[in-house]
Amino acid sequence: MFDFASYHRAATLADAINLLADNPQAKLLAGGTDVLIQLHHHNDRYRHIVDIHNLAELRGITLAEDGSLRIGSATTFTQLIEDPITQRHLPALCAAATSIAGPQIRNVATYGGNICNGATSADSATPTLIYDAKLEIHSPRGVRFVPINGFHTGPGKVSLEHDEILVAFHFPPQPKEHAGSAHFKYAMRDAMDISTIGCAAHCRLDNGNFSELRLAFGVAAPTPIRCQHAEQTAQNAPLNLQTLEAISESVLQDVAPRSSWRASKEFRLHLIQTMTKKVISEAVAAAGGKLQ
């Protein structure tokens, strides 16, 4: 049995917010794939629980008439993978979700939980960055919307107050023509492993040039990051291997990996350059282009 000091199952989103406000020590339980591990190890910071996994307000994937998308924060990774809307409009997010753990974990682990735990290795963070998502956050003070870029503030830290709940992700309309995206993850095992390096790219093409590139990396810095120098190098550059090489050099100005038992800093830098070329090449191919 888990050593709960208090356990509350919220009936509504408003109920959950009030429960958090009334108990500053409380932690949210959605999928439970992270929280239950902490409970198993008797982490005292997780003895007060507010259960939100059944809240309808946190579920669902919807497509608006203007092409924008809303994904509830308690949407599971299996639901992300299987939904035709995400398959069509956010393929890199689906690819990232497929790379997470195994089917049993994906059936319960939530998109919002993966982002809010603040890990730089969170596989869903890089596609969320390249698709320019905004986060809908509720609290006793009302509702605020914040960009995903900057939401991660440090290792294991996000811009979320104790009494705030991430309710949904909002994605702007994605371009339909001459645009493509891709995700790639390197890990020591092919499945059931944490990323050594993860990345995602989104590009738009115009008459043989990059009109836009968005490139994001995880485990390449203390937080998931967008690679501004690499993106600027691609701006209006010709669609050729020389440009790809220049991007893979400039990305080194954006990253700051460290050595760990998983990989040395030097190996991670090598991976970053190699994966930059791979993920951009795949995004270009998805956009109908070809690097000459």
Swiss-Prot record:
* Domain FAD-binding PCMH-type: start-end pairs: 1-176
Cellular component terms per the entry's GO annotation: cytoplasm; xanthine dehydrogenase complex
Q: Which reaction does it catalyse?
A: xanthine + NAD(+) + H2O = urate + NADH + H(+); hypoxanthine + NAD(+) + H2O = xanthine + NADH + H(+)
List, in alphabetical order, the Gene Ontology terms for molecular function in this entry.
FAD binding; xanthine dehydrogenase activity
Q: How does it assemble?
A: Heterotrimer of XdhA, XdhB and XdhC.
What pathway does the UniProt record associate with this protein?
Answer: Purine metabolism; hypoxanthine degradation; urate from hypoxanthine: step 1/2; Purine metabolism; hypoxanthine degradation; urate from hypoxanthine: step 2/2
- This chain's protein is named Putative xanthine dehydrogenase FAD-binding subunit XdhB
Q: Signal peptide location in the record?
A: none
Task: List UniProt keywords, sorted A-Z.
Answer: FAD, Flavoprotein, NAD, Oxidoreductase, Purine metabolism, Purine salvage
Q: What does this protein do?
A: Presumed to be a dehydrogenase, but possibly an oxidase. Participates in limited purine salvage (requires aspartate) but does not support aerobic growth on purines as the sole carbon source (purine catabolism).
State the Pfam families in the record: CO_deh_flav_C, FAD_binding_5
Name the EC number(s).
1.17.1.4
What cofactor does this protein call for? FAD
Q: Gene encoding this polypeptide?
A: xdhB
The UniProt entry's GO biological process terms, in alphabetical order, are: hypoxanthine catabolic process; purine ribonucleoside salvage
Classification via InterPro entries: CO_DH_flav_C, CO_DH_flav_C_dom_sf, Diverse_Substr_Oxidored, FAD-bd_PCMH, FAD-bd_PCMH-like_sf, FAD-bd_PCMH_sub1, FAD-bd_PCMH_sub2, Mopterin_DH_FAD-bd
The entry marks the following residues as binding FAD, namely 27-34, 109-113, 165, 184
Q: Which organism is it from?
A: Escherichia coli (strain K12)
Q: Which top-level enzyme class is recorded in the Swiss-Prot or TrEMBL entry?
A: oxidoreductase
